[in-house]
């Protein structure tokens, strides 16, 4: 059962300007260490950060809160499964909000797709409640 859907579209140039203007202050406030390591190693650094920013916005929308109600930027991080598929890892307020969405006897599956085509980056998040298998 789908319990949340979110999407976001962002201009990569906006993220690039913010990175130039605020540097590590912006990176440390918004992105996890894993996201920073991944993005800093990329040739298209601003596009990598923009996709991750869009993923966080989309995830916050799927949670039904936006960046509010105890959900902070660093509570949501883009990670990859062993096969390379992107997904979201939630902590803190985001993890608490996720638990509120889930019916009893279910676990969450967070589906994420991210893409970019300069000057835009886009993300879609679907949060699914799956029955717990005993």
From Swiss-Prot:
The keyword Transcription does not apply. One of its GO terms (cellular component) is cytoplasm. It catalyses: apo-[ACP] + CoA = holo-[ACP] + adenosine 3',5'-bisphosphate + H(+). Keywords: Cytoplasm, Fatty acid biosynthesis, Fatty acid metabolism, Lipid biosynthesis, Lipid metabolism, Magnesium, Metal-binding, Transferase. Its cofactor is Mg(2+). It is an enzyme of class 2 (transferase). GO terms for biological process: fatty acid biosynthetic process. Pfam families: ACPS (PF01648). It is found in: Cytoplasm. HAMAP family: AcpS. Belongs to the P-Pant transferase superfamily. AcpS family. Transfers the 4'-phosphopantetheine moiety from coenzyme A to a Ser of acyl-carrier-protein. This is Holo-[acyl-carrier-protein] synthase. It comes from Brucella canis (strain ATCC 23365 / NCTC 10854 / RM-666).
């Amino acid at each position: 059962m789908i319990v949340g859907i979110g999407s976001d579209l962002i201009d990569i140039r906006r993220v690039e300007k913010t990175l130039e203007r605020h540097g590590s202050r912006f990176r440390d406030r918004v992105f996890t260490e894993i996201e920073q390591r991944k993005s800093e190693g990329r040739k298209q650094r601003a596009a990598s950060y923009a996709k991750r920013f869009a993923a966080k916005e989309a995830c916050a929308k799927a949670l039904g809160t936006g960046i509010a109600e105890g959900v902070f930027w660093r509570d949501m991080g883009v990670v990859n499964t062993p096969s390379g598929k992107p997904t979201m890892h939630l902590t803190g307020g985001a993890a608490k909000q996720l638990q509120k969405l889930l019916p009893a006897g279910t676990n969450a599956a967070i589906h994420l797709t991210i893409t970019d085509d300069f000057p835009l980056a886009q993300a879609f998040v679907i949060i699914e409640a799956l029955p717990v298998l005993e």
